[in-house]
C-alpha cells in the first residue's frame, strides 16, 4: 500500500505477486485495462482474467487487451457505477463483442433474483456478476446493523454520488450524501483525492453504525 492507502506501481505489482501466489481461479480489474503483468501472470498460471466495464468502448478495449471475461456493469450497481442502465448496456456490449468469441460476458448491476439472472441471459449475457447481495448473507462479516439497513432499504433510497471516491458510486441515501447535494456544498475532488476527505469521516461513521450507535 502506498501513502494513505493508495497504490503505486511497485505496491500494485507486489499485491499481484501475493494474489498469484495463492491458488486463485479468477482475477478482475476495473478502472482501465489490466496491467500487462496481470495479464501475463494470469496466462502463465491459467487464471481467468476479467474486467469491469460501463460502456461498449470500454468493453472493446478490454476485449482487445486479452481478458477472458467482460463484466458489463450498469448504473444500478452498488459502489462504483457508470451512467448506462444494465438493461441497455448488456445487449449493447453483447452486440459490440459478437466477433470476440474468446470473451464471455457477464451482466452486473442491480441483479439479485433468479428472474433477473434469467433476464440478463435472455439479453445475451453468458451469466451474471453479483456483489451487494452477498453483504447480507450469513457468512458475510458485515455488521448486523448494516445488514439490516441493506435489506430494509428500498430501491428508491439509493443515490449516485461522487461524495465518497470522486467517481460516481451508488450508495444508500444518508445525511452524508444529502450534505454533498446542498447548493452550498463544494464540488467533490477528483479520485483519489476525495477519499482523503471522505474516508476518515465515513470510517468513524461505519464503526459507530456497527455498534448500532444513534444520535
Give the positions of each predicted feature.
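Intrinsically disordered, low-complexity regions enriched in small/polar residues
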Residues: 8, 214-215
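Conserved active-site-proximal phosphate/metal-binding subdomains
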Residues: 83-106, 112-213
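Active-site entrance/lid segments in N-terminal catalytic domains of soluble metabolic enzymes
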Residues: 1-101
